[in-house]
Amino acid sequence: MFKFSEEGIAKFTIFCFFYLILIFVSMATLPGNADSHEVDKDSLNCLAKNIYFEARGEEIIGQYAIGLVTLNRVKDKDFPNNICDVVYQAIKINNKIVKYKCQFSWYCDGKSDTPKDLQTWYKAINIADTLLHFNVEDFTRGSRFYHADYVVPKWSKNKKVLIRIGKHIFYE
């Protein structure tokens, strides 16, 4: 009879989890929010990073909401027309990003943009993949802006509140 150590079982479980994620992410694209075209890995990664860094402490519905806002911006003529450009939109001076002058604060806060919590990161990848490959109802009501409920940005005074989800307030 074989005996497996707890460490060996844990490593095997992590390997299987990575493998399943890889299979899931590489599945054929289905019609959905991605306008029925294949989604590139960069778009998936950019959307997942935005979900991870903007909403990793939220319930799953709040994480989906952040992803939906990102996609709503891609569809809006006032924003760039691809996911990565929306996520990394920032003010630059001499080709350098100005700290705290970007659309999503995690990108220009001076901290690492590498996800540390792998379990939460894989959850963000799955949410991003679902949003890009399936028709997910936009329960944010078309929101293009949001902020955490513990701050009141200047821009929010001129926006109409559409919905509150978790720790975020969403605007048109």
For each of these PLM feature ranges, what is it?
Residues T13-S26:
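Hydrophobic membrane-insertion alpha-helices, especially the h-region
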Residues L30-E172:
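Bacterial extracytoplasmic/cell-wall-associated proteins, especially those involved in peptidoglycan
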Residues M1-I9:
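Short, Lys/Arg-rich N-terminal segment immediately upstream of the first membrane anchor
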